[in-house]
Amino acid sequence: MFKNVFANLQKVGKSLMLPVSVLPIAGILLGIGSAHFNFLPDILSQIMAQTGGSVFSNMPLIFAIGVALGFTNNDGVAALAAVVSYGILIQTLTAVEPIVLHTTIEVIKNKHLSDTGILGGIIAGAISAYMFNKFYRIQLPEYLGFFAGKRFVPIISGLSAILIGVILSLIWPPIGHGIQIFSKWAAYQNPILAFALYGLVERALVPFGLHHIWNVPFQMQIGEYTNSIGQVFHGDIARYMAGDSTAGNLSGGFIFKMYGLPGAALAIWHTSKKENKTKIGSIMISAALTAFLTGITEPIEFSFIIVAPVLYVIHAILAGLSFPLCIFLDMRAGTSFSHGFIDFIVLSGNSHHILLFPIIGILYGLLYYILFYLFIINFNLDTPGRENIKNNILEKDNNEIAPYIITALGGKNNIKNLDACITRLRITVSDISKVKQKDLKNIGAAGIIISGSGIQVVFGTRSENIKTAMDECIKNI
């Protein structure tokens, strides 16, 4: 049972990556536009702010589409059904809640009592995905043949959304009230404790690929800010971009991603065997630069998470502490995606105490370096370079390594589903015993996670391109 739940949660995490992928461009537009830089004409700032803001305002709908696509192998009909479901779901809530709460529609709209936020989008996406998978091959009588098959999906999804909307209108008031209480506590009353918990749990979930689910309420839901033209923004990311001075509580990510983990990478390099230092140095420096520039840290984390889990425990604790540290020092900076130098510079317009970031960051990197160095040496941990290294073939291009990966996964016929997120391949196989983990490691996988018939293979930022190359290779086999 747990394996099935884990597999489904992986699908949820993967499906949430599509909506998240629009955040960088939306965040840059909104962040720069809201900062009102002197070198930008006012009209250009307004255009950037409003276009970026429009994306954040429609995030529930975008999440509905993302969830629908994630559970239906990117079928466009499911996306259309998600749009229909979301619109009907929200309007049903708006119509029924006045009866349930004994108030008027105007009060419902003014107080956002029917605003389900991201959760409403996820529910609508789940409705359309379920209906698609159940009915996309449905046969109808000949006189209704036009509505058979996939054309039936938006219809049944919309009708189902009415029923779900009525049910949701009965249970949403206490749920919404609970979310508001948590939101106020996390964003305004005790952000130090809330974001310490966020940082610790978020890193703990990274090995399982489930951190995207945990990110959503903090990044997209907590807190509320209304700008000068009446646009309402939820979540720490959007509120910061829109100019909310109380947002920016996610700033701790810059400390451990841009400075902490690169310090750990240097420690791994410096503790490697003499004969391996050149190879490990090139790998770790490349991974450190990736973390510093983009905030993508899995290439470093998966270099030690399997062979030295105690180091990952230390890392998760330090990552969790970086968030309350920044909040305590009133250090605020915005991220659109993953806490890298690019985000840090581009979105610096609304930042606070920005010069403290490199100072605290370098100290944090030094702390990481010392702790990792001491633990590796004193406990003789088998981090990369401290054992005999076999040459792998990852230096080949994506098209060349794709056949090797397919073979290591048990061949074309053993692969039931193939997908990828930012740093890892997500695969479902027919027979897990046919998967050759050792071969995947020799190819260059930074980490491998198996649960039931699901397997995640970490190849860093090349994963999406490797997946595309594998798709082409599978078609031609």
UniProtKB/Swiss-Prot annotation:
- Give a Pfam family name: PTS_EIIC
Protein name, UniProt field:
PTS system glucose-specific EIICB component
Q: What are the EC numbers? A: 2.7.1.199
Q: Which organism does this sequence originate in?
A: Buchnera aphidicola subsp. Acyrthosiphon pisum (strain APS)
Q: What does this protein do?
A: The phosphoenolpyruvate-dependent sugar phosphotransferase system (sugar PTS), a major carbohydrate active transport system, catalyzes the phosphorylation of incoming sugar substrates concomitantly with their translocation across the cell membrane. The enzyme II complex composed of PtsG and Crr is involved in glucose transport.
The record, for InterPro entries, names: Glu_permease_IIB, PTrfase_EIIB_Cys, PTS_EIIC, PTS_EIIC_1, PTS_Glucose_EIICBA, PTS_IIB_1, PTS_IIBC_glc
GO CC annotations? plasma membrane
Extract one GO molecular function annotation from the record: kinase activity
Localisation: Cell inner membrane
**One GO biological process from the UniProt record?**
D-glucose transmembrane transport
Q: Where is the PTS EIIB type-1 domain?
A: 399-477
> Where are its TM segments located?
15-35, 51-71, 76-96, 112-132, 152-172, 191-211, 250-270, 280-300, 304-324, 357-377
Family annotation (CDD domains): PTS_IIB_glc
What's the chief localization of this chain?
membrane
- Give the residues annotated as active site: C421 (phosphocysteine intermediate)
Q: Which reaction does it catalyse?
A: N(pros)-phospho-L-histidyl-[protein] + D-glucose(out) = D-glucose 6-phosphate(in) + L-histidyl-[protein]
Q: Is Aminoacyl-tRNA synthetase among this UniProt entry's keywords? A: no
